[in-house]
Amino acid sequence: MKIKRKGLVLVSLLAATAMALVGCSSPTTPATASGASSFNAAVDGIVNPSTVKGGTVKLLSSTDCDSWDPQNTYYGWCWNMQRLFTRSLLGYQKVNGSKPVLAPDLATDMGTHNADFTKWTYTLQKGLKYSDGTDITPKDVKYGIERLFATDIINGGPASYFLATISHPADYLGPYKSGDLASIVTTDSTIEFNLSTSYSDFNYLMAMAASAPVPYKVEGGTGFVGADYGKQPVSSGPFVFTKYVPTQSVSFVRNKFWKQSTDKIRKPVANEIDLTIDSDENDIDSKLSAGTADARADLDVGTTLKSKILTNPKVKVNADNPTTAFTRYLTVMPSVITNVYCRQAIFYAANKAELVQAFGGTTAGVAAGSMTPPTIAGHSATANMYSSGKDNTGDVAKAKAALVKCGQPNGFTTKVAYATPSQLAPKVFASLQTALARVGIKVTETTSAASSYYSTFIGSPTNIVNQGIGIAMAAWGADFPTGYGFWNSIANGADIVPTGNTNYPSLNDPVVNKILDAAPNGKSTDADFRKLDDQVMKDAVYLPILFGKSLYYRNPRLTNVTSDNALAFGLYDFVNVGTGGK
């Protein structure tokens, strides 16, 4: 997933480049039996457990979501916020701070499948209702997923998984232009998916926000359909999406038609959760420090609050530093830098030691020699195809040799893209610029607002070429914890789309494609994903920088605080957070 940001990624899933990947080197202190606050207490525990209801939780973010449409969002923090007002057939449940597991949400159980994983059937619970009191039906779940096929309208979410697995005519363009999709069969209480290929991980798709129901009869109401649905999405969860002012604020108030008896995943206690969007990172830090805001919804803390956390034990007890399953990297575009040796020159010349420092120092994460993070199949702790030397400052000699091979012995010029606002991305750019200049590669910066960076700036292959973007900052976390969940969206050549493309370099390598195509059948092993990682590195399109950690801060007044580790970067699970009724 995209790590906005967060800087998900993924996360991430951010702009991915806007994220403050900061952490602390102190050992983790587990939550005590009483749930008392301590450093890292929310990572694998629950801080201040409470059943007291009422109050308003006050959240901040530096940018708006890429979309509030559940089918059209791909930022990890926005997936986390979707848990407030949308539900899906399945979801992630975290009991008493344990690791999250898949669990039924709208469905009565985990569903059933046939022997070859090509047919999946789920039964909906009775008594499920939207915030307007109307029934949630299997047809609504079907309609929401059909919307993913309307890629001319819904082009920012994880549609590639669904398009690659659910059987459909080649000319099916979603419900707006093509109507009903016959391969998804519904009754009054069940929904059946007929797939075009075996897919043993299908339950993970049913836990995505993209599987949330959308009322097929009215969608978002008059004027809020298609691309505008994200301005007024219908609520199926415990909170109602309301008072939305784009790029400024949104509120979530209790859904009187939601029933705790139908929801074993969420246990909300707050009356209201307010999100204020503030592009001033220092202002966000100040509000968190002063206690006028409760937590940041999208990113790590900024540099000012980070310093306080690292130096003041009284502040540190209210912070958490989860290790995250995402990789921060630079995408080197073969459509702009066409010669593989020219791309390799960038890999060798990059000063990873300085890049890690620019991202927040050693507390930001561990320098990466390959793309696959430690928690995902195919990871190798020793892989490092483009060695940056013993001190990770780059191998200038090898970079110059690669430039000779690509016919550019004196270097070349290109552009580096990143999302704004960001405290760190300009520092990362400056570090990269200095390192590449050592071998004659000259770079200039080009930026885009975080809200459009992934969808239409680097998410558009045509725009990459038109803008001459040779390098783009990004970060990625697994959409679900498998090799396929990490790699498919960023490396499968079959899933390249005109906008909202997450395979930023438009990689279409037959070796990579073959492994990914075999994965849904359960035929790709850890060794295969190790081979995939090696092949991607040979293609020199993804330059891994670090495996990340994040630093978050929670207001001491908050209750029921725990990390949502189902996402790539451990943000707090805000749906269950309270204020002790205040």
Predicted regions and their residues:
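N-terminal lobe/hinge region of extracytoplasmic solute-binding protein
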Residues: 58-115, 234
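Structural transition elements
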Residues: 239, 363-405, 420-427
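Extracellular/periplasmic solute-recognition and catalytic clefts
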Residues: 155, 242-253, 262, 274-335, ...
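Alpha-helical secondary-structure segments
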Residues: 58, 136-146, 188-194, 198, ...
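Surface-exposed binding/hinge segments that line
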Residues: 123, 142, 147-150, 154-218, ...
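Detector for C-terminal structural segments
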Residues: 245, 350-381, 424-434, 460-582
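Bacterial lipoprotein signal-peptidase II cleavage site
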Residues: 24-33
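Gly/Pro-rich hinge or "lid" segments in bacterial periplasmic/extracellular proteins
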Residues: 94-97, 198-267, 272
